[in-house]
A protein has these predicted regions:
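Active-site-proximal substrate-binding core of FAD-dependent oxidoreductases
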Residues: 86-96, 105, 239-246, 304-310
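Helical element adjacent to the flavin cofactor pocket in flavoenzyme catalytic cores
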Residues: 1-61
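A glycine-rich dinucleotide-binding beta-alpha-beta segment and adjacent secondary-structure elements
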Residues: 28, 34-37, 212-284, 291
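Internal hydrophobic alpha-helix adjacent to the cofactor/substrate pocket in enzyme cavities
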Residues: 80, 217-222, 298-310
Length: 310
């Protein structure tokens, strides 16, 4: 897939541009954060200029880390010298599954479409709605044509190619992290002025033993006739570990902070004024989209931090 079209969905860059224009924030661009820490009650950030490589140090009353679960985890592990120690991260594993329909649509290559998914399917596996699997459906993308067998890309097979594309859709699905294999992380020291090295690998997935996956595929298959969406099960594939973009829980919230968990304000046991505010602090990762949940939790942490005595 070729990604999301520019400006059709919300981007935090839009809000940031508005804040910069109003003078409410000062944006420091062209920098890469290398380390964070605290000296007394004063947190600091060491960053490197991407042009020239000069190191700079910033101090503040509070530091909020929102580099994405992987970026924040790497930054924290490197800053706390947690090298050659295995850590875990939860992932909502991603799978891809093509579908065919009996009834054709118009030729999708002639439609004014965008590369966002056209519709979603949610498979509920319990009465509470906690165990969910979500599938995002895409009806056409230039990648479809490029992935067709060679015979269907032949100029003389245009009629057959059109017939296939009129009936083909493609789903990207997710399983919740509590039934997905976990990711393993290990940090290695880097040279001075360089970002911490981070090795990532996945536990043995053992898909054939995944009961939740079998239930999801069974539910999807049972809905095939009324929806006219027939899954091509032999073409089920799983993304490599860490490729789902649905990960977190490397420093999950807990009632008491530790070296591997954070308190309800996103602080490990070593820090009082450095707060983790992205998905790295989630207790687990759902199969549904969770960007708004990340934003709401970050807002809650920032509000709580501001309410504390400075």
């Amino acid at each position: 897939m070729t990604g999301c079209p520019f400006s059709l969905i919300y981007s935090a860059a839009t809000t940031m541009d508005q804040l910069r224009a109003s003078g409410r924030v000062t944006y420091q661009g062209g920098l890469m954060a290398l380390r964070v820490g605290e000296e007394g009650d004063r947190p600091w950030v060491e960053a490197k200029e991407l042009r020239g490589g000069r190191l700079r140090r910033f101090e503040a009353d509070r530091v909020f880390l929102a580099s994405g679960a992987f970026g924040t985890t790497r930054l924290v592990m490197g800053s706390q010298d947690r090298f050659d120690q295995d850590m875990t991260m939860q992932e909502s594993v991603q799978f891809t599954l093509p579908f065919v329909s009996m009834r054709p649509t118009v030729d999708p290559r002639t439609e004014q479409l965008f590369t966002l998914n056209q519709f979603n399917m949610v498979v509920r596996l319990d009465e509470q709605g906690r165990d969910l699997s979500q599938l995002h459906f895409y009806t056409y993308n230039p990648a479809f044509s490029a992935a067709l067998p060679g015979g269907l890309r032949w100029q003389g097979a245009r009629f057959l190619t059109t017939a296939v594309l009129q009936r083909l859709s493609f789903a990207i699905g997710y399983l919740p992290s509590w039934v997905s294999p976990r990711l393993r992380l290990r940090a290695r020291p880097s040279r001075p002025g360089e970002v911490t090295e981070l090795r990532v690998w996945r536990e043995d997935p053992r898909w054939h033993r995944n009961r939740t996956l079998r239930r999801v595929l069974s539910r999807v298959a049972r809905a095939s006739a009324p929806l006219d969406l027939w899954p091509v099960l032999p073409e089920l594939h799983f993304a490599a570990g860490g490729k789902s973009y649905h990960w977190g829980s490397s420093f999950p919230h807990s009632t008491r902070a530790s070296s591997t968990s954070t308190d309800t304000l996103g602080r490990t046991d070593r820090w009082r004024r450095v707060h983790l505010v992205d998905a790295s602090v989630f207790p687990d990762v759902p199969a549904t989209t969770f960007t708004l949940t990340i934003m709401a939790n970050a807002h809650r942490i920032a509000t709580g931090a501001l309410a504390e005595a400075w």
